[in-house]
């Protein structure tokens, strides 16, 4: 619901940017929904800040175009997820839509080539887990992890664990998203 004089919270590692963005959005929305706008910079910041309790009232704005990363953010149960910079008017419109609690996802249409199980492997590798830790976490055999990672590397066109990690965190050289 829209709340007059409620505080829109912009969550960022840069307090000045957060304050300026809050002021600019308040000027465009005299009444605004009670939501948190999380600026996912550096990449991964949103995973630290969004909790299961806060996800349903959180919008995340990210620069990471990795489809698996975007899916992982969305699967937190976010109210909204947007890729790349938006104009202040676009951000204000996203926040207006929050009144209905309609989930909004404005991300590239590119879909992951990975199965859900392979996506789990990529996510855990990208968080620094070793194969044995991944096997324990997923309740599968170490050899299953190794075989699965081989398929992940093939599908992503990477040749190593390190390249897969760089891909997930959107640091690898990839073709630009349109």
Task: Go through the PLM ranges and name each one.
Residues 1-105:
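N-terminal regulatory/sensing modules of transcriptional regulators
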Residues 91-92, 153, 171:
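Short secondary-structure boundary/hinge segments and terminal tails
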Residues 97, 127, 170-171:
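Residues within well-ordered alpha-helical secondary structure of globular protein domains
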Residues 100, 114, 158:
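Hydrophobic patch in the ABC ATPase nucleotide-binding domain
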Residues 105-109, 159, 178:
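Short, polar/charged, Gly/Pro-enriched helix-capping and turn/loop motifs at alpha-helix termini
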Residues 105-144:
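Helix-turn-helix DNA-binding segment
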Residues 128-163, 167:
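Recognition helix of helix-turn-helix DNA-binding domains
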Residues 171-178:
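…primarily DNA-binding HTH/wHTH and HhH modules…
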């Amino acid at each position: 619901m829209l709340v007059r004089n409620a505080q829109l919270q912009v969550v960022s590692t840069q307090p000045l940017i957060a304050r300026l963005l809050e002021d600019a959005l308040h000027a465009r929305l005299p009444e605004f929904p009670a939501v948190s706008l999380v600026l996912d910079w550096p990449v991964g910041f949103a995973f630290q800040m969004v909790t299961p309790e806060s996800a349903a009232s959180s919008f995340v704005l990210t620069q990471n175009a990795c489809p698996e990363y975007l899916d992982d953010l969305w699967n937190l149960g976010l109210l909204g997820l947007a890729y790349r910079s938006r104009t202040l008017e676009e951000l204000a419109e996203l926040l207006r839509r929050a009144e209905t609690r309609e989930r909004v996802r404005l991300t590239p249409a590119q879909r992951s080539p990975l199965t859900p199980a392979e996506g789990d492997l990529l996510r855990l590798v990208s968080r620094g887990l070793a194969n044995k830790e991944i096997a324990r976490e997923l309740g599968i055999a170490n050899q299953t992890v190794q075989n699965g990672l081989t398929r992940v590397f093939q599908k992503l066109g990477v040749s190593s664990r390190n390249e897969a990690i760089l891909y997930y965190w959107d640091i690898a050289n990839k073709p630009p998203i349109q």
